[in-house]
């Protein structure tokens, strides 16, 4: 199986598709990914989901399972299969217990989240396996004593949660010291590179947001930068498709 970039015939929007060993699109995956493209989900998100579903259908194919008839035990087998190095996933080679897991807990949980969305989508079209990954639990009070204003209206509503989720340690973000930041700025030989890194440091915006900036997004007098979702030739994207305005320093604008 393979994942390939495609462009939607009607809108020209970039999307992704999973092809089987017969070089034909995997129909249920194609339908869901096309839906995500229509509702303007990020191309990077769709790409990640495509790879997640490729792994799932490769596992189903290897074990001769129908994607509409899977059991909870099959999901557990999929998680164990993901942790194996790809070269031994066909089961012909035994793996020692000391071998490091190939897929982290966070990556496995992301794949489970993709499967949950995939099965929820198809459950709305008459395929009744979405509850395998998404269970319902009675509504209850959140932790602590705080209650939202309309808590009394929603406390009896069932809440959705994933049936299976691996415990994953929280990763602390890595930060640069002021000395490291200055060293990087001083090492930039071109003003363009120095400006890009200074924008990231001063505003805290994401790299995709910075790479999509245009002159019209800068308000010099107000000392503000507006992040605007748009289609860029360099494929830079604003995460979540949300626009916002960020205050910046006068020193940055002088660059």
Show the residue positions of the predicted features.
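Conserved tyrosine-mediated DNA breakage-rejoining catalytic core shared by Y-recombinases
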Residues: 208, 212-254
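Basic, Lys/Arg- and aromatic-enriched nucleic-acid-binding interface segment
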Residues: 168-207, 211, 242
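N-terminal DNA-binding module of tyrosine recombinases/phage integrases
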Residues: 2-39, 61-62
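N-terminal core-binding DNA-recognition domain of tyrosine recombinases/integrases
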Residues: 29-44, 54-151, 183
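DNA breakage-rejoining catalytic core of tyrosine-based enzymes
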Residues: 142-182, 222, 235-250
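Major-groove DNA-contacting interfaces characterized by cationic-aromatic clusters
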Residues: 95-96, 163-167, 229-230, 250-255
């Amino acid at each position: 199986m393979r994942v390939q970039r495609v462009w939607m015939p009607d809108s020209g929007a970039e999307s992704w598709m999973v092809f089987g060993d017969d070089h034909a699109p995997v129909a249920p995956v194609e339908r869901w990914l096309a839906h995500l493209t229509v509702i303007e989900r990020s191309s990077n998100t769709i790409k990640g989901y495509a790879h997640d579903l490729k792994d799932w259908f490769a596992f189903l194919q290897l074990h001769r399972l129908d994607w509409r008839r899977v059991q909870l035990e099959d999901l557990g087998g999929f998680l164990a299969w993901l942790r194996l190095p790809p070269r031994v996933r066909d089961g012909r080679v035994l793996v020692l217990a000391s071998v490091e897991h190939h897929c982290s807990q966070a990556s496995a949980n992301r794949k489970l989240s993709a499967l949950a969305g995939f099965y929820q989508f198809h459950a709305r079209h008459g395929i009744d396996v979405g509850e395998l990954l998404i269970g319902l639990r009675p509504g209850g009070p959140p932790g602590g004593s705080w209650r939202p204003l309309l808590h009394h209206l929603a406390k009896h509503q069932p809440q959705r949660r994933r049936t299976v989720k691996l415990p994953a340690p929280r990763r602390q973000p890595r930060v640069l010291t002021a000395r490291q930041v200055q060293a990087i700025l001083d090492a930039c030989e071109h003003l363009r590179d120095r400006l890009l890194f200074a924008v990231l440091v001063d505003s805290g915006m994401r790299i995709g947001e910075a790479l999509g900036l245009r002159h019209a997004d800068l308000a010099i007098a107000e000392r503000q930068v507006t992040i605007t979702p748009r289609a860029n030739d360099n494929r830079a994207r604003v995460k979540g498709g949300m626009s916002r305005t960020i205050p910046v320093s006068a020193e940055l604008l002088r660059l």
